[in-house]
C-alpha cells in the first residue's frame, strides 16, 4: 500500500510538471544565446491574453522552452490590433522583477515570431545575494523572470520558517505558481512545511486554503491532517463532498487512511448504498475494501439470494469468492 501510494505520487508529480520545461540545473552557467519568441494560432476571442512561447538553444543542446498565457497589457508595445492585422514589424518588452526581455520581429494574421534580448535586473540580483541566496546567473535570472518570481516570495518563505531557498528552488516555485500569497494562504491554514519541495508538491496537487478548510469542517479527525494525507487525498480523488457523503451514511468516524484505501479499491457511496439495500448496513470500512478486492458485488449477493443463500456475512462472501463459487453454476 505504502509503495503504491509513493509510486502514484511520483507519477502524478511527473505528469503535472511536464508542461513547462525549465533549463536543466547543469546548464545554469551557460550563456543564453539567441532567445526566440513565437505566437501561433491566436484565439479569435479577444480575452486580453496571448499564448507566448520563448525558446533558447539550438536543437536539443542547451535548449529551454517556456510557454504560457500572458496578459497583453504586460507585453509593452504589442497590441491586439497588431496581431489581428496584416503582417508588420513589432517591438515589445516584458518587464519583470528579475529582468526584462526586449523583443522584436513580425506579427499579424493572429501569429508572430522574432527574437529577444534579456537584461537581468541588477537590483533584484543584489537583493538575492544580500539574503544569502546567491547571485543568479544570466540563465537563472531569465528563468526567474519568466517564472514571475518576485522578491516578496523570498520574504514570505522566511516569515513562515522555510529553509533558505536556492535560486533553482525559486524557479521551481514560480513555475508551479507558488507565489508569496500562496505561501501565506497555506500558512494561514496551519501548514508551515519547512521544505520548499513540500510547498511545490502542495501546489502541484492543487492543495489550497479552501480545500484544507473544507476538510477541517467535516470533523475533528480531518483537522490538522498531515501533509501526506492531503497529498494522497488529491492523488486519489478524496474530496470534501465524498467524505461528507460517508459521514451521512453512518461513518462519522471514518479516517483518512481508510478513505484512501477505499478510493484505491473502488469503494464508493453507491456501492455502500447497494449493500445497505441488500441488508448490509454499517459494514466496517476495512470489510468494504475486502469485498471490493475480492470482487463481491451487489449482483453477486443478489444471485446468492436467488439460490436461497440468505445474508451471508461479509467474511463468508469473501470466502465464497476465494473458493471460486459462482451462483447458478455447479
Give each language-model segment a name.
Residues 4-13:
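Sec-dependent N-terminal signal peptides
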Residues 16-330:
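General marker for long, soluble alpha-helical cores
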